[in-house]
Amino acid sequence: LTPEGTFLDDMIVYRMAPIHFLLVVNAGNLAKDYAWVSEQVKATGDAVAIDSSSRYALIAIQGPASREVLQPLTGVELADIAPFWFSHGEVANARATVARTGYTGEDGYEIFIPPNMADRVWQAILESGRSADVVPAGLGARDTLRLEASMRLYGNDIDESTTVLEAGLGWIIG
């Protein structure tokens, strides 16, 4: 949030280690968000911001069958990952961070993998999900689900002129 209580963006922050954080931002705002974060950490004098976006591909599997489809592909015990938490391991023999997050309002997982492994993991998920009728879904489907779940999208539903209260998200202020 800005000092005025409006939105800079909508992001998820993962604490990977005591002094190592991974920020997952709206891809369309990457440059703006990176500039803002860099400014904030520079002001502290004891932190560094690194744009590591090219080191990750992200694949999301969402919905009631997500655990059933993903579990055979990983040694990570998916049931043990609490919502908005993550675990490190492998998915389809690719080094991965598996987070129990998503942008659909459904239970599901986001898988962070090296970009050169994305096709392998994607194909493995589709194969594992065949019996559960898993099919790829695009942004239109995601937008329908996020709207039904009252999840806001920066640039569509919220922007730098929208306050938290106007967006109906007063619960995020602590």
Q: What residue spans do the PLM features occupy?
A:
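Acidic, proline/glycine-enriched N-terminal capping motif
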Residues: 1, 6-8, 140
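Conserved, structured C-terminal
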Residues: 16-174
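Short active-site-adjacent helix-start/loop capping segments
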Residues: 8-9, 32
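Glycine-rich, Trp-frequent "lid" loop and neighboring beta-strands that shape
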Residues: 12
